[in-house]
Amino acid sequence: TRKLELLPAMISPANRADALEQTGAAVYNRIREAQLEGGSRVRYSDDLIEYQKGLAELSGAGLYQISVEGETGCAAVEYVDRDSVLCKELLISPAHMERAVALIAVRHPARRYHVRTPACWEGLPGGYLQPFGMVKWYNRDKEALWAACTHSYMGLGFD
């Protein structure tokens, strides 16, 4: 996972042409899969995304569909506390991430923003890689396949 911590002064103003809308689990999951298509990743059922939606809403945030310059992305956002927002996953092309974060900041004012994106995406300047999750194989054939591609995206942590 690539992580980034931002203060409000580091976030550009939102573009009025862009949009952030709260969305349901099935729509979120469809956008998520489209954004991650072709890459190695953990796939979640709509039920697990619904669980994440509940966690996000309990904190005062939610699951969002993001539109920037004709591209549709998504973000799972939670308040960690009243001053900190965690974007558990931001899935939109790196070229549009800055504008997506600006939309999140307008919707969820905070003193600090933590943003997670897939490790293989360049993302925003200042991001760093942090291993997230662990895989233990009990099937040697599948373990051999994994060795060919060790960079995979787990995404949501149900914490």
What is each PLM-predicted segment?
Residues T1-E89, P94-A95:
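Amide-forming acyltransferase catalytic core, primarily the GNAT-like/NAT-type
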Residues T1-P13, E89-E98, A102-D159:
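Active-site/acyl-donor-binding loops of N-acyltransferases
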